[in-house]
């Protein structure tokens, strides 16, 4: 018998702890199949070991919460003429927006699909000669800028590429345009090659003189969404108590 196991992205201790239960249950259902018929033949093993004790749907996560919040804000501002997204999730935020308006998506990674209301272009937002100046009046970049310059998705290694990306996005947006922006927040650091984590104080300096902050929301360490948070000195100083949270800014270009 050919015995192939596919386990992807799973910590070793999880595998060692939960795999015996998986094998026991596999033997049990094989025995049931022998007695009840073999309408479904068994193929390779595909263990899913981490989901048994999770809440249904996995909804309370950074992406799920930010995607819904920002899509709702764009829906309320639907009078804006051209929305462009930079690197956000196609199967989350972009899909939400495409349900009620057209959206242009720019990403360093390629895509092969044809979906109504989504227009894709492969582009590197950290290119020094990036064009499209004053191109749109609505722009989003959700949980993407933290990857700039770290090579995770085939992009170049450059310690300061988040600054290049910031400048290119600023040039792309028209004056008075809306910018919806999110990144991980907490003590400032790089966890190579996954992502950067930004302190809130750094982000405020990062945007100073470029944008007015219309609202700030965040997802905390317990995956709770707090909307319209006040950016007071104490909260900014301790990153709203986050080690790895998600800061979500609604901005207007000056």
Regions found by a protein language model. Give the residues of each.
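A short glycine-rich, Lys/Arg-flanked "PGG" loop and its adjoining helix->strand segment in the class I
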Residues: 157-175
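A conserved beta-strand element that flanks and buttresses the S-adenosyl-L-methionine
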Residues: 140-145, 149
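N-terminal accessory regions of S-adenosyl-L-methionine
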Residues: 1-82, 93, 192-210, 214-250, ...
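Class I SAM-dependent methyltransferase SAM/SAH-binding core
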Residues: 82-130
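Conserved beta-strand signature within the Rossmann-like core of class I S-adenosyl-L-methionine
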Residues: 176-184
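Short, conserved loop/helix-junction motifs that constitute active-site signature segments
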Residues: 77, 96-98, 174
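Short, flexible/disordered intra-domain loops and linkers
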Residues: 59, 150-162, 190-195
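A short acidic, Gly/Pro-enriched loop at the edge of an enzyme's catalytic core
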Residues: 128-139
């Amino acid at each position: 018998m050919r015995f192939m196991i596919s386990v992807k992205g799973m910590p070793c201790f999880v595998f060692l702890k939960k795999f015996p239960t998986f094998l026991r249950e596999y033997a049990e259902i094989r025995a049931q199949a022998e007695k009840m018929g073999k309408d479904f033949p068994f193929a390779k093993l595909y263990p899913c070991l981490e989901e048994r004790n999770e809440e249904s749907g996995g909804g309370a996560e950074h992406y799920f919460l930010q995607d819904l919040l920002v899509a709702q804000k764009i829906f309320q501002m639907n009078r804006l003429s051209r929305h462009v997204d930079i690197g956000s999730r196609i199967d989350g935020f972009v899909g939400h927006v495409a349900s009620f308006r057209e959206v242009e998506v720019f990403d360093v990674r390629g895509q092969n699909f044809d979906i109504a209301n989504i227009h894709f272009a492969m582009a590197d937002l950290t290119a020094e000669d990036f064009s499209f100046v004053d191109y749109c009046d609505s722009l989003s970049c959700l949980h993407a800028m933290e990857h700039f310059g770290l090579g995770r998705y085939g992009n170049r290694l450059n310690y300061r590429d988040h600054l290049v990306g910031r400048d290119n996005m600023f040039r792309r947006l028209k004056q008075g345009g809306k910018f919806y922006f999110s990144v991980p927040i907490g003590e400032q650091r790089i966890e190579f090659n996954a992502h950067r984590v930004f302190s809130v104080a750094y982000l405020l300096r990062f945007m100073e003189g470029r944008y007015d902050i219309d609202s700030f929301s965040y997802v905390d360490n317990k995956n709770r969404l707090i909307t319209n948070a006040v950016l007071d000195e104490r909260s900014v100083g301790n990153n709203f108590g986050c080690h790895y949270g998600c800061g979500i800014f609604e901005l207007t270009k000056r």
